[in-house]
Regions:
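Extreme N-terminal leader/targeting segments of oxidoreductases
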Residues: 1-22, 37-41
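C-terminal accessory subdomains/tails of enzymes that are appended
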Residues: 11, 20, 51-52, 97, ...
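Short hydrophobic core segments
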Residues: 25, 220-230
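Glycine-rich Rossmann-fold phosphate-binding loop(s) that bind the pyrophosphate
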Residues: 27-28, 50
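Glycine-rich FAD pyrophosphate-binding loop
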Residues: 39-59
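Dinucleotide-binding Rossmann-like beta1-alpha1 core, especially the glycine-rich loop
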Residues: 63-148
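A conserved short coil-to-beta-strand element within the FAD-binding core of flavoproteins
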Residues: 190-205
């Protein structure tokens, strides 16, 4: 129980009025990566996250660790090379959350890519990204393309490119990186908002933190303060009076989820839209998800929501490339909207703005990491910690070791790399029956939790009676107990949205088990009736947002 929601207060009380080497603001993939890199080099590190871990951009992406083929179009060769090479590292360090996925890129007469440009583009991509031989691109003619995916539009189809991307669960990736950081001595707290800075002689030396669950205030000191708050980095720079020069430009991306019965896509596709953008359609766990939009966004970054226009745009894109499926809004089972924190570039559309990352340091010494991509999180973290350790060394601290995260498994990833994963899963599937699980349930646990599965097996043994008491099957209760005791799950929405991804990919399961889950959490975390009602309402709002566009919600509220 190293990272339990029951120990949040202990962590906050333990660092109150204390000084650490590094304070990281933001518990998304960037902040988690910095915590892991810093802790493994011997820096005392704490992460403060004002929502839940990965609640911002890091649970709302296209869920691909991808090399950024489209950046070749913008001639961002260095980014493609760096990010492409990182994909394989991210995969090997956590093969239970990231997996290779062959992607089909169909090309039609008049489309973005033609046969020649696709062939050359993918070859350059393979070269830059250092793609291993078995995953190098293939080129298909019209018939081969339709064999791979018969739903693709036949009219004007000339052929297709076939190349490997890596599919991930972004929120799981984030929490696994954070858990590994905790194993190495880092600390992290969710629902802990940094609402101001502490200064000494004009230099930032600490933060004021509010526990958003009970309103208590803490002061924590740090030799270096890193602002890794994603869409909120400028908000923190304003508090530091240092928002000048470069700034963020937020862009919103929406994805829709459709059941495979209605959209039986057998193959991940990267395809043209009518307005010459490109979007992904990806099969996953009995569903197909499609996205993303890319539009400038100036509303509350904490609650980006799908609009009717967003939904219509994606439905039109689906029906343009897959005309036989005839998707309508009735087919949309769930959705999510996220905000990309891009670095503003004058005169560029949202899709044209670079996804590169940069470090900015203010006069007070506040270090901000801005921009960047999910795929590049490890490299970004290494760069930030290199920067921090150099500063500390200049100030007289002894030298710190170099980063070692390149070959370091994340939590759950201790399965002897991708080559060891299938045998590991098979072995654990066979062991599960000893703990009251079916073979299928044990296999699902092993796939989902990787090398942490033994902890879940142990919990299954201990909580058998509780499962009966709270009227939950083991395969619901055990992930919940694990999420609370080992993944600092403080609210029902943390469990259903981020720890399990169920609001997006298994929304009926959420409706089935939400009441039992809420009752269990209320009992174990000692909620008042008011707290239970508040957290229940939060989950209901997340379920509504997944299905009903925000403008329709506003219209309904106005009429009520």
């Amino acid at each position: 129980m190293k990272f339990s929601s029951k120990q949040r207060k202990d962590v906050l009380n333990g660092v109150n009025k204390q000084e650490l080497d590094v304070i990281v603001i933001g518990g998304g993939i960037t902040g988690s990566g910095i915590a892991l890199d810093g802790a493994t080099r011997g820096l005392s590190t704490i992460v403060f996250e004002m929502q839940d871990f990965a609640a911002g951009t890091s649970s709302r992406s296209t869920k691909l660790v991808h090399g950024g083929l489209r950046y070749l179009k913008q001639l961002e060769v260095k980014m493609v090379a760096e990010v492409g090479k990182e994909r394989a590292i991210v995969y090997e360090n956590g093969p239970h959350v990231t997996t290779p996925e062959w992607m089909l890129l169909p090309f039609h007469t008049g489309g973005t890519f033609g046969s020649f440009s696709t062939s050359i583009g993918l070859r350059v991509y393979d070269f830059l990204a250092g793609v291993k031989r078995s995953e190098r691109r293939k080129m298909f003619n019209r018939e081969e393309t339709l064999n791979k995916e018969p739903l693709v539009k036949k009219e004007g189809l000339k052929g297709g490119g076939y190349y490997v991307e890596y599919r991930t669960d972004d929120a799981r990736l984030t929490i696994e990186v954070m858990k590994e950081a905790i194993e190495h001595g880092a600390k992290a707290v969710n629902y802990a908002k940094v609402d101001g800075f502490l200064y000494k002689d004009g230099k930032v030396c600490g933060v004021r933190v509010i526990d958003l669950l009970d309103g208590e205030v803490y002061e924590v000191y740090g030799k270096k303060i890193v602002n890794a708050a994603g869409p909120w980095v400028d908000t923190l720079r304003e508090k530091d009076n240092s928002k000048k020069g470069k700034v963020l430009q937020l862009s919103k991306g929406v994805h829709l989820v459709i059941d495979q019965k209605r959209f039986p896509l057998g193959q991940a596709i990267y395809f043209d839209t009518p307005d010459k953008r490109m979007v992904f359609a990806i099969p996953r766990g009995g569903k197909t998800y499609v996205g993303t939009t890319d539009t400038f966004y100036d509303k509350d970054a904490a609650v980006p929501q799908m609009t009717t226009e967003d939904r219509t745009y994606i439905i039109n894109a689906i029906n343009y490339m897959f005309p036989s499926v005839k998707i309508t809004e009735k087919d949309i089972e769930s959705s999510w909207a996220g905000v990309r924190p891009l670095i503003y570039e004058e005169g560029k559309s949202a899709s044209e703005i670079s996804r590169k990352d940069e470090i900015w340091t203010s006069e007070s010494g506040l270090i901000t990491i801005a921009g960047g991509k999910l795929t590049g999180y490890r490299k970004m973290a290494e760069m930030v910690v290199d920067y921090v350790t150099n500063l500390l060394q200049k100030e007289g601290h002894s030298a710190y070791p170099k980063s070692t995260t390149k070959h370091m498994p994340i939590s759950g990833g201790h399965v002897d790399g991708s080559k060891g994963l299938p045998a590991f899963i098979a072995k654990k599937a066979g062991e599960g029956t000893k703990y009251g699980l079916t073979t299928a349930q044990a296999e699902e646990f092993a796939k989902f939790y990787g090398s942490n599965v033994d902890i879940l097996f142990d919990l299954a043994k201990k909580h058998k009676d509780e499962a009966k008491e709270y009227n939950m099957p083991l395969d619901v209760l055990i992930p919940l107990v694990y999420a609370m005791d080992y993944e600092m799950t403080a609210k029902p929405v943390d469990f259903f949205v981020r720890r399990r991804g169920a609001v997006f990919f298994n929304i009926h399961w959420v409706y089935e088990w939400k009441e039992a889950v809420i009752n269990y959490m209320a009992a174990k975390l000692g909620w008042s009736k008011e707290e239970q009602m508040k957290y229940t309402a939060e989950l209901e709002k997340a379920l509504t947002d997944a299905v009903v566009p925000v403008d329709q919600q506003e219209q309904a509220a106005a009429l009520a």
